[in-house]
């Protein structure tokens, strides 16, 4: 398999939005080819966090991660942050070469900030570039609002990645059309 042009998609769920304070509680990855065809779905890992960390989550995170069942999966998880990083890297190395794929997803800079602090080996696996679907979303909302993609965010990492890939496919078909 030619790994050079594969795209690595990632999503994290966190205890909050502060990359210097909050923790990762779920990680998922998907690998696509350059045409956005899914090649493989990586492990979806709930990352154990102790009760004092979970208790610090704000009401929004408590509500959404509680309703999805993620908080309970975090409590029951046998994976710490380093183990989740190692398992994710082991999966990705089968489909991409270090430094080749941009990090892909929605609002991916936020995920990258968390990876930089908490999973630095995984963050270093990616090219320095980002493929951030939310940038395209913001431009489409302003320039082509009739083509805006509406999605139901589940705040479950794997489904959020699938939705991001679907969103980019949508924009590819409607905005990034072949000019010839």
From Swiss-Prot:
Residues that span the membrane, as ranges: none
InterPro entries assigned to the protein according to its UniProt record, in alphabetical order: Exonuclease_RNaseT/DNA_pol3, Oligoribonuclease, RNaseH-like_sf, RNaseH_sf
Top-level taxonomic group: Bacteria
Residues of the signal peptide: none
EC number: 3.1.15.-
Residue positions of the active site: 128
GO terms under cellular component: cytoplasm
GO MF annotations in UniProt: 3'-5'-RNA exonuclease activity; nucleic acid binding
Segments forming domain Exonuclease: 7-168
Keyword list, A-Z: Cytoplasm, Exonuclease, Hydrolase, Nuclease
Subcellular location: Cytoplasm
EC primary class: hydrolase
Main location: cytoplasm
Gene Ontology biological process terms in this record: DNA metabolic process
Role of this protein: 3'-to-5' exoribonuclease specific for small oligoribonucleotides.
Similarity comment: Belongs to the oligoribonuclease family.
Protein name, per record: Oligoribonuclease
Organism annotation: Dichelobacter nodosus (strain VCS1703A)
């Amino acid at each position: 398999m030619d790994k050079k042009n594969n795209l690595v998609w990632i999503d994290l769920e966190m205890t909050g939005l502060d990359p210097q304070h909050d923790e990762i509680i779920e990680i998922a990855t998907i690998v696509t080819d350059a045409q956005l065809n899914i090649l493989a779905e990586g492990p979806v890992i709930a990352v154990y966090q102790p009760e004092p960390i979970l208790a610090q989550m704000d009401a929004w995170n408590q509500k959404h991660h509680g309703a999805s069942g993620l908080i309970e999966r975090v409590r029951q998880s046998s994976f710490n942050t380093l183990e989740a990083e190692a398992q994710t890297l082991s999966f990705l190395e089968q489909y991409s070469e270090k430094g080749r794929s941009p990090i892909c997803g929605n609002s991916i800079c936020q995920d990258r900030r968390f990876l930089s602090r908490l999973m630095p080996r995984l963050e270093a696996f990616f090219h320095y570039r980002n493929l951030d679907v939310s940038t395209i979303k913001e431009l489409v909302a302003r320039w082509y609002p009739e083509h805006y993609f509406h999605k139901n965010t589940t705040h479950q990492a794997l489904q959020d990645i699938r939705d991001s890939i679907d969103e980019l496919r949508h924009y590819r078909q409607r905005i990034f059309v072949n000019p010839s």
